[in-house]
Amino acid sequence: MSVNVNRSVSDQFYRYKMPRLIAKVEGKGNGIKTVIVNMVDVAKALNRPPTYPTKYFGCELGAQTQFDVKNDRYIVNGSHEANKLQDMLDGFIKKFVLCPECENPETDLHVNPKKQTIGNSCKACGYRGMLDTHHKLCTFILKNPPENSDSGTGKKEKEKKNRKGKDKENGSVSSSETPPPPPPPNEINPPPHTMEEEEDDDWGEDTTEEAQRRRMDEISDHAKVLTLSDDLERTIEERVNILFDFVKKKKEEGVIDSSDKEIVAEAERLDVKAMGPLVLTEVLFNEKIREQIKKYRRHFLRFCHNNKKAQRYLLHGLECVVAMHQAQLISKIPHILKEMYDADLLEEEVIISWSEKASKKYVSKELAKEIRVKAEPFIKWLKEAEEESSGGEEEDEDENIEVVYSKAASVPKVETVKSDNKDDDIDIDAI
């Protein structure tokens, strides 16, 4: 039976599957051990050597591990249940397999033993970063890098040269049954011109339209998108800059008002949709931000609707705008937040969470704190309104119960309940 590689995803049609871990306990007493029967298959699904998850179990359990690569036996000392190991495998997948950006298990590890670093690159979204090497398993990985690691490039080049030499030799022998006599020692026999052309053809084949079309037929639709878009191979900062130039150009051309769909499509193409509000605030907002919130509400709503991450970037963008127009905007923070809240660009939870911690990532620490101090009246109002609404919900539940029971009662009783509801509504508005 197969399970999702990322078990936090409950979709039964999730494309990334792996076999469920099968563990077999062998031996007795001090010699008891757990053999992971299908570790090779599990590791293949994760695109990692089978020694990595086995060693991870040993690190987490404080147990010794044994690897019998020839017989495909991977052993953890002690008695351990399969379900326990399966849950522990989720930790390994999260730390060493899933991409931190898109959470897809399409990553490769790049080990540099000299610098003692382990890089991580994602083939799905183009993410590149470094792993935290504090885990004990990282020491094992640095000593035993995977075969596809950059540390093995020298070995690969040698194999490539050897292959190339063999191809030349095979080509020269195939022309006749007996090889030609060797040239005199003082003469150098250059390779025939036809062979050079063949080699050039081999190297140039990748760039021809026919070769590209043939390769495109062999790869999946998802990989097609990545291959066709070179921009996805760039860093996040470069992709955000591309989006910034795109939005700025639309504004300069005077078509920004009707370009909301195009801007969202471009952000999705670059895989930086959550950061879209940060770009929009920089291009579209100035000291007249309160008027501009209403004018460009549709643009921001396409990014921020039901997207808390995008809403957080909108708040960070607001901080940047305040930093540029501090004299005009610092006193208007509560009103600006209220405008954004009323426009459904921000949710209560996101605003309250933002107000609790000042960050110096986008503006200075002092300004970030000052902005939050100025926002306190609105935050206080927001919290009080939330408490009142929760209290009102409880009252509504009681009223609903009254109405349900009043169906069995006489008509005058139902009318009385309705009149009470109206009075309650008036009281809530007054509050």
Curated annotation (Swiss-Prot):
Q: Where is this chain compositionally biased, Pro residues type?
A: 178-193
Sorted alphabetically, the Gene Ontology cellular component annotations on this record are:
cytoplasm; cytosol; plasma membrane; synapse
Give the span(s) annotated as Disordered. 143-216
Q: Which residues form the W2 domain?
A: 233-392
Its subcellular locations are:
Cytoplasm
Principal subcellular localization: cytoplasm
Crosslink (Glycyl lysine isopeptide (Lys-Gly) (interchain with G-Cter in SUMO2)) position = K413, K418
List compositional bias (Acidic residues) regions by residue number.
196-209
Q: GO terms for molecular function, please?
A: cadherin binding; eukaryotic initiation factor eIF2 binding; GDP-dissociation inhibitor activity; GTP binding; GTPase activator activity; RNA binding; translation initiation factor activity
Q: Where is the composition biased (Basic and acidic residues)?
A: 153-170
**What name goes with this protein?**
Eukaryotic translation initiation factor 5
Species of provenance: Homo sapiens
